Structures are given as C-alpha cells and as structure tokens.
Amino acid sequence: LNDDPEKEVSFSSSLLTPSEEIYNETRKRENYLLDVDNEVVIPINKKIRFLITSQDVIHAWWVPDFAVKKDAIPGFVHESWAIVEEPGIYRGQCAELCGKQHGFMPIVVRAVEQAEYEEWLVGKQEEAKAVFETVGKEWTQEELMVKGEEVYTRVCSVCHQANGQGLPPAFPSLVGTGLA
C-alpha cells in the first residue's frame, strides 16, 4: 500500500457467507456471497497500487467502481492502481471462470479517511506480530479444537457441509474418518 516496508501488510480473505445460507438452511443476508472475513482497507484520496497474482489457477481481480480488472496468473505479478475519492465499501469478484469455487470469491475494499486507515494498519501489524509469537507455542487440545472449528467453518464447510456429511461423490463425508 505504500513505499515504507515498515508499513507493508499482507493478508488473505475468505468468503464470509455461512454454508447454511449456501445450502438454503437459513435466510440469505443482504450481501449473500459478497462478504469476506478480511476486507482490503485503503485510504481515500491517495494513489493505491495493487499487486495482483495467484497461487493456483488464473483468476481476475475485478472491482467495477475502480475500473480495474486484472488477471491474476500464477508466477506473474500484475499491477493496477486507483484513487478512491469517497469513503465506502466497494465490491468486486473474481471475473475469470477459475473452477468450482469461482462463485465464492468476492472482493471487498473499504475506503476510509487517512486516520482510520492508520488505525487499521497498526491493528494489522499487531495481529501479524501476535501470530508470529505463536510459532513455538504449545497448544492445548481445547485451543486446537477452537482453532480447527474456526478453519473448518470458514474454509471446509462450503463443500463438506457444516455437519461434515459432504456432498458425495464430489465432496465425501468426513464423518467417522478421524479428520473431523
């Protein structure tokens, strides 16, 4: 987001929509399939440089309000930029048919005043430091179960369902396998 290496932030985000909404077990919220757990935050009235790549297949980073659609290709880094003048939430999505999860790849950018951005940045740096400090930690079974449930709910339940029974044959049941 800037030229100061001390202020660099790297993170990923995942779809926030719970599997219960996807499988019509509960009512869908207003931004169904459009919310993420970790939105990109940028300051307004500054030129923001986006570096775009992929770890797996070709994707496309598309945010219509920024007039940006750039391919994300493994092994390549593409760049784009935008100047956002109004605070607000800007939504986009993957615009390249990239596989079975294509419909579950929203992009959320929150544009804020500079002071709010600085607060967000400090918070992200503190989160990164806290994660780094857990590298050698001895985790209790209870702590590991809590972390595992968070990951399963966020990542796995979309295919394997909240109850672990999956959608055979494409997504096998995890019940009784020792994996869940």
Residue locations for each model-derived region?
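Non-transmembrane, membrane-proximal soluble domains of secreted or membrane proteins
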Residues: 1-147
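Gly/Gly-Pro-rich "capping" loops immediately C-terminal to redox-active cysteine motifs
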Residues: 83, 106-113, 166-180
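Cys/His/Pro-rich metal-binding microdomains
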Residues: 95, 157, 172
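Sequence/structural segment immediately N-terminal to covalent heme-attachment motifs in c-type
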Residues: 141-167, 175-180
